[in-house]
């Protein structure tokens, strides 16, 4: 019995286990990859600096936006970690991706030019912001699954010394009121 499926999104095929998180529409993944990718391409100071993919899930941002960069993918979910190891196998083998099996809040941060964080609805909160700011990023891209937690986390990032440079609202669920804000700080 196989406990995973494959989805096409972000220009490639992904393995997703039954208990791993993945957007319910591949078109939604494509939209997020496009928005986050444009922010990184436009606002990161150099094209190949190190990147942290926080709350990495199955590895979407590590292997789309992170191409051409060395990436540390931080994830705590066991099934997501297993999927990420499969999805990122070639990049793990060539040393351009390292997986950190940890909750972001307990992870020992490493310096990174870019941080991409896509937390669950609860958001980053103080501990997530505190840890990720220790990476000393030049660019911090926050994907918000909930507008209230995004607003709280954006305020925490501003208090930590960052400035909101760009905000895009992505309609991942057409016909509903749910949207996902994506901010570049």
Where are these regions (language model features)?
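Rossmann-like S-adenosyl-L-methionine
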Residues: 1-185
């Amino acid at each position: 019995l196989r406990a995973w499926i494959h989805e096409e999104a972000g220009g490639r095929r992904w393995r997703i286990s039954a208990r791993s998180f993945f957007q319910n529409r591949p078109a939604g993944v494509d939209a997020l990859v496009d928005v986050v990718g444009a922010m990184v391409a436009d606002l990161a100071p150099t094209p190949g600096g190190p990147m942290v993919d926080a709350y990495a899930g199955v590895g979407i941002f590590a292997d789309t936006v992170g191409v051409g960069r060395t990436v540390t993918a931080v994830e705590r979910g066991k099934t997501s970690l297993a999927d990420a190891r499969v999805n990122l196998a070639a990049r793990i083998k060539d040393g351009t991706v390292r997986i950190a099996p940890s909750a972001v809040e307990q992870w020992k941060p490493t310096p990174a030019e870019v941080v991409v964080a896509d937390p669950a609805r609860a958001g980053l909160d103080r501990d997530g912001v505190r840890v990720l700011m220790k990476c000393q990023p030049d660019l911090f891209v926050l994907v918000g699954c909930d507008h209230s937690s995004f607003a709280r986390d954006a305020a925490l990032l501003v208090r930590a010394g960052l400035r909101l440079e760009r905000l895009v609202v992505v309609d991942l669920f057409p016909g509903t009121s749910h949207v996902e804000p994506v901010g570049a700080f």
